[in-house]
Regions:
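Bacterial N-terminal signal peptides that target proteins for export
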Residues: 1-10
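Bacterial N-terminal signal peptides
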Residues: 9-20
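Acidic (Asp/Glu) and glycine-rich low-complexity loops/linkers
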Residues: 21-136, 140-154, 160-169, 179-189, ...
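Short, surface-exposed interaction patches in beta-rich subdomains
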Residues: 161-163, 168-261
Length: 261
């Protein structure tokens, strides 16, 4: 066979392969009623949640898989609370046969979001209201802003929130990482057990209650009114400034540093 014939055959094979892959792809879309949203999706590569104008009381969900038949175990429910879950709990091993699955969700501005993730899913969240997340595994969650935070991390998951304006609670068991860019919150409760890290880049906090057990590290580059700080083990707590009451306790080789006005 000539070189030209080989090239033509390769081109035909490539085009037919693309067509075959496209034919195998699957897409599902749902519009649900709901005042809040709960998301619990196993074995998904990416979930993006964004606010959209004109969606009062509605949630629009679209899921795409590179392989046909992979979305049949998705469960969509509407009502007072909208939810999307996946019945599957064991993920296929990594490799060429593993399907790529992504989910896009549009919600009303300010909607409360509750996320549960037990794997390595990447969550991208826009400006929402209340944001609760329970992350077990090695996933990522980034959010533009939230008005109220409750984050629970067990494992090595990472959470990054651009801005917060309400109370926050963060609990880390393991080597997880949590960061807020800028904050103006009335209260912040932190509990780190293990080697987890919590960082606040800038802002103001009314009441800070922070405890580290293990080798974790807290770096709070915000102005705090009242703070209660404690370490057990080799952990480290640093607070840029405390203007009011400061209470601290330490057991082990850890350090507590707090600037005073």
């Amino acid at each position: 066979m000539s070189r030209h014939s080989l090239s033509a055959a390769a081109a035909i094979f490539f085009v037919s392969s693309l067509a075959s892959l496209a034919a195998r792809a699957e897409t599902v879309s749902q519009t649900l009623d709901g005042k809040t949203l709960s998301v619990d999706l196993a074995c998904v590569d990416k979930v993006e949640i964004q606010p959209s104008a004109g969606l009062a009381g509605k949630v629009v969900i679209g899921a795409t898989s590179s392989k046909d038949g992979e979305l049949k175990d998705f469960v969509f429910k509407g009502g007072e609370a909208a939810s999307v879950t996946r019945e599957r709990r064991s993920c296929p091993s990594t490799g060429l046969d593993r399907p790529k699955i992504s989910v896009s969700i549009q919600v009303p501005a300010g909607m409360a979001i509750d996320i549960t993730n037990g794997g390595s899913t990447n969550y991208v969240v826009g400006a929402v209201g209340v944001l609760h997340a329970r992350l077990a595994g090695s996933g990522y969650l980034t959010a533009v802003s939230a008005t109220d935070l409750d984050i629970r991390i067990s494992g090595s998951s990472s959470v990054n929130v651009g801005q917060t304006t309400g109370p926050a609670t963060v609990k880390i068991a393991g080597s997880g990482d949590f960061r807020i860019g800028n904050t103006d919150m009335p209260s912040f409760k932190i509990d780190v057990r293990g080697s987890g890290k919590v960082t606040i880049d800038n802002g103001r906090i009314g009441t800070l209650t922070a405890a580290v057990a293990g080798s974790g590290a807290l770096k709070i580059m915000a102005t705090v009114q009242d703070a209660t700080l404690s370490t057990v083990g080799s952990g480290d707590i640093e607070v840029a400034k405390v203007t009011g009451t400061l209470s601290s306790s330490k057991a082990g080789s850890g350090t507590i540093r707090a600037g005073r006005s």
